């Protein structure tokens, strides 16, 4: 489907492999995707989106899903990353790429090296969906620090969120 049709459709496409594991997590996955739909009704999608903006978008969606359906239904792109791995390994690499623009430049940071290589992009030394995991914890940090609720944060520009969490990176 070309970009113009996608913009007119304003939807989200997903593939689900039906089995006991995926079906039990379907409500949380749908909540995650619905959060994206809500956000992009208020924040215009741009093809030159920064890594920071994408991480906030994914972090908002996963925090919303966890708030609705519990931590036990957190996506494996977050739950499989330990805090030690996040702090010692992932955050320092991602911090260097926060303001890169465009999916071709941010794919490895967001999805990890394996997917980047598969798509023909350069690897940066990150595991599967490292940017999703970091985005989840970045937004969680923001919500806890500010006391803001997920609904109002979902429609807030990424720059405003980033401006309040500079200490997340130290």
Language model: regions and residue ranges:
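An acidic intrinsically disordered interaction segment
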Residues: 20-34, 86-110
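Pan-zinc metallopeptidase signature
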Residues: 95-170
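Secondary-structure boundary elements
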Residues: 19-23, 27, 31, 66-74, ...
């Amino acid at each position: 489907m070309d970009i113009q049709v996608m913009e007119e459709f304003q939807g989200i496409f997903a593939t689900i492999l039906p089995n006991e594991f995926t079906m039990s997590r379907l409500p949380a996955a749908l909540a995650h995707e619905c959060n994206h739909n809500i956000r992009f009704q208020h924040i215009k999608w741009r093809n030159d989106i920064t890594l920071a903006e994408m991480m906030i978008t994914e972090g908002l969606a996963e925090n919303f899903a966890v708030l609705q359906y519990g931590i036990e239904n957190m996506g494996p792109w977050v739950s499989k990353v330990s805090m030690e791995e996040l702090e010692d390994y992932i955050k320092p690499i991602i911090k260097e790429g926060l303001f890169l623009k465009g999916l071709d430049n941010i794919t490895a940071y967001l999805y990890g090296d394996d997917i980047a290589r598969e798509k023909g992009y350069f690897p940066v030394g990150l595991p599967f969906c490292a940017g999703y995991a970091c985005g989840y914890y970045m937004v969680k940090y923001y919500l806890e620090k500010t006391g803001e609720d997920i609904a109002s944060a979902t429609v807030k520009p990424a720059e405003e969120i980033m401006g309040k969490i500079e200490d997340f990176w130290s």
